[in-house]
């Protein structure tokens, strides 16, 4: 479509985001509720956005700025560090580590090749293909059996077994506070809105019911800290689109069901893994094929 081509070339919008944040934090030994995790994501996101802008600026010097650059905040001399919600500094005090003022001058002089650069996508399919954790989300279990049109897909978290005790699992989180804070640190620097998710485990509430006050608190906190939008509200009900293998000793799980939804218990023994319901061979294959995660990821050194 010619009109779409004209608009696309005029703005050259990009949406670059994260895949495997849970793995990144597990390698650092941080849980989603740890302040060090929030500080790490703050540091990572600042460098992430800075170098996206720097690369786009260098492309603008080489190929010219995008036609509609003048319609962006960047053309007005504004950077993400200028207009984020300052309440986020209550979580992690603001600290500039990058040469933002030098970059501001370069952008004012040469512009940017792209009108937008960063966005956080769900990345469900990409994560499966690359055997990474899903976007910025905590995994629901160490081993998941995901349904698809071509049959069940077994996926184990990266770095297992070395990192199995360092992962934050979704339904183990005491609250959404850590996740909300992490998304807030990202939104501080990202130039497009992030649609975050809220997750509730009724087993952690009185009478196994999630009170409206808890949901209202999360919504207002997210708004206060700079969230623009939210997407899923997940509730743990022992069913869903994924069949999950839960770590032993965490909570009761449904082992058998009359329908297609089945959740199985993952049990750790001294001599390795054993999975009830006859899944042991499948788990052993995943265990063997999942390489040791001894190296330090490049992002960890930022």
Language-model segment annotations:
Residues 7-29, 189:
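Core structural elements
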């Amino acid at each position: 479509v010619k009109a779409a081509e004209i608009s696309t070339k005029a703005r050259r919008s990009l949406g670059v985001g994260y895949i495997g944040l849970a793995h990144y934090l597990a390698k650092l030994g941080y849980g989603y509720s740890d302040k060090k995790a929030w500080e790490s994501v703050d540091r990572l996101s600042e460098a992430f956005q800075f170098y996206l802008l720097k690369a786009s600026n260098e492309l603008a010097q080489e190929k010219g700025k995008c036609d509609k650059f003048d319609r962006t905040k960047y053309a007005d001399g504004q950077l993400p560090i200028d207009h984020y919600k300052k309440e986020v500094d209550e979580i992690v005090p603001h600290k500039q580590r990058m040469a933002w003022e030098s970059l501001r001058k370069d952008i004012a002089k040469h512009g940017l090749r792209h009108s937008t650069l960063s966005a956080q996508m769900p990345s469900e399919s990409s994560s499966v293909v690359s055997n990474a954790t899903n976007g910025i989300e905590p995994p629901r279990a160490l081993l998941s059996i995901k349904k698809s049109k071509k049959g069940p897909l077994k996926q184990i978290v990266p770095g297992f077994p070395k990192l199995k005790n360092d992962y934050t699992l979704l339904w183990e989180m005491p609250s959404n506070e850590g996740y909300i804070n992490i998304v807030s640190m990202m939104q501080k620097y990202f130039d497009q809105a992030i649609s975050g998710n809220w997750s509730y485990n009724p087993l952690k509430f009185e009478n196994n019911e999630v009170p409206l006050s808890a949901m209202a608190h999360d919504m207002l906190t997210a708004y206060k800290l700079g969230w623009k939008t939210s997407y899923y509200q997940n509730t743990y009900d022992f069913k869903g689109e994924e069949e999950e293998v839960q770590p032993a000793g965490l909570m009761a799980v449904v082992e058998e069901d009359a329908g297609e939804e089945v959740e199985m218990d993952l049990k750790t023994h001294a001599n390795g893994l054993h999975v009830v319901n006859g899944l042991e061979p499948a788990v052993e294959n995943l265990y063997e094929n999942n390489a040791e995660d001894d190296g330090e990821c490049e992002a960890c050194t930022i």
